[in-house]
Amino acid sequence: MCGIVGYIGYQDVKEILLRGLEKLEYRGYDSAGIAVLNESGVHVFKEKGRIADLRRIVDPNVNATVGIGHTRWATHGAPSRVNAHPHQSASGRFTLVHNGVIENYEMVKRDYLADVAFQSDTDTEVIVQLVEKFVRDGLTTEEAFRKTLSLLKGSYAIAMIDAQDENTIYAAKNKSPLLVGLGDGFNVVASDAMAMLQVTNQFVELMDGELVIVTSENVTIQTLNGETVKRKPFTAELDASDIEKGTYPHYMLKEIDEQPFVIRRIIQKYQDDNGELAIDKAIINEVLNADRLYIVACGTSYHAGLVGKQLIESWAKIPVEVHIASEFSYNMPLLSEKPLFIFISQSGETADSRAVLVQTNKLGYKAITITNVPGSTLSREADYTLLLHAGPEIAVASTKAYTAQIAVLAILAAAAAKAKGFELDFDLTKELAIVANVMEMLCDAKEEMEKIASDYLTLTRNCFFIGRAVDYYVCLEGALKLKEISYIQAEGFAGGELKHGTIALIEDGTPVIALATQEHVNLSIRGNVKEVVARGANPCVISMRGLEGDGDRFIIPAVHPDLTPLVSVVPLQLIAYYAALHRGCDVDKPRNLAKSVTVE
């Protein structure tokens, strides 16, 4: 949930670190800091708040060519300057940044560091104080670093500098992402390649239980046992322009607008030599061999999984269960005889999902990861990967990854159906192309969406979304988008469930957004709208062309009924965006949230 960077080379390091941290703010932005090392010692700058707040306190007169940085999402200790990283050892010799959670930090603190006066409330400070203790006991820095790592339980990505050695960064990884970037006369470490695209596109992945000794000329990867590891670098297939806002005021709006292009790219990427949509035969064989599919995901990805379940069961006639990853880990259901797991994660680093994958791997079950990030932890540890090809998603609130996940699940469902002899009565390629065109039209309806947000949501404290069948799943996502960026208490409900309790919350003026895109439940959902209107609600009905009724606020051009979630979500994304904007909220970086949730 935090982001770390490090640089060692020949350039002044401050701006490289700050720009790198700006690219990692999606991982957390409670506080931030950098530490740079030169002949006069270590200079630490840290501040509560955003990278912009940190920039204001960095001394421009301090020059150095080695340094580390961190942007934080608090897990241990409140957001504050004291708890911000980097943390230093008691003497100030060692300075360290850390992403992850040290589960046994209290035990380590008690058993090894009882005589140390700690400066913060974080688990991270235990690491740097322990390194110094072992150096005082006579170990070299590398030996002390290695011994410290051997005592830690939990997740970590660490970068550390030694005030007595301007030529080295020490780094390590376990269950939290960390890459080493390679350059000519310099090397870097980072949680994400995006952070260091400014200086290199060549990276080496670290695996769990590995540490790395980084100098300006060499990178030495080792196991905790001291064995040297050789690993080929990869080229990050990102352009720096992909992670810039360009002319957009916010990343979220840019990413909403990118959705039509993402759908078209997915069509292109998943076409075989005959121009037909297809999935790798090995994956389809696994799907056919399974007696039940288990989709495991969190948040927006979980909502995409619910739509995927509908498509797979309807088209391929394969039973599917969808589970919240954080619950599955601690309450595994009774599994079928031949389960196949599908993990959905935009980042491929979601800790809750990875915890389930570790369990299922131990049990010997096959797994597929659907992710936007090739080479991510979930991608590496699953048997198969289906890529989203959505491009970098920077805004914390997911938009284009959600629709990409549904599109890929649709292609998987269609391929499995075809392999089982269930031919679809429509051309999925053509229908997805229509979806992309309709998405484009919806993205052009920003003024109408802004007006809806203004009319219904500017002053409200709560909002309800209602739908039936697959519309209900989209309502869950619409409510999540609204609550996470506008801070309006929003909930999505199945229309028929209102009368079983929720309708008690309806009062004069309560906004209720209803989706009506499914013909077989159209009359039912409109009956539910009448129920809330009778209790004083202020209804906003968004319907599909051909199913519209009198008074509907917005009508979506028609697409195939099974693919409506791909388009009906776009108005909800835009409504949430403008509601947040009107309320003065930080659209891209909502409070208390982080994009890549790498702690359980």
Curated annotation (Swiss-Prot):
User: Do you know which PANTHER family this protein is assigned to?
Assistant: GLUCOSAMINE--FRUCTOSE-6-PHOSPHATE AMINOTRANSFERASE, ISOMERIZING, GLUTAMINE--FRUCTOSE-6-PHOSPHATE TRANSAMINASE (ISOMERIZING)
Q: What is its EC number?
A: 2.6.1.16
Any one Pfam family match given in the protein's UniProt record, by short name: SIS
Q: InterPro entries annotated for this entry?
A: GATase_2_dom, GFAT, GFAT_N, GlmS/AgaS_SIS, GlmS/FrlB_SIS, Ntn_hydrolases_N, SIS_dom, SIS_dom_sf
- What is the name listed in the Swiss-Prot or TrEMBL entry for this protein? Glutamine--fructose-6-phosphate aminotransferase [isomerizing]
Q: Which GO terms describe its cellular component?
A: cytosol
List, for all copies, the residue spans of the domain called SIS: 283-422, 452-590
The answer to whether keyword Transferase applies is: yes
Q: Which residues form the Glutamine amidotransferase type-2 domain?
A: 2-217
The UniProt keywords, alphabetically, are:
Aminotransferase, Cytoplasm, Glutamine amidotransferase, Repeat, Transferase
- UniProt-listed SUPFAM superfamilies: N-terminal nucleophile aminohydrolases (Ntn hydrolases), SIS domain
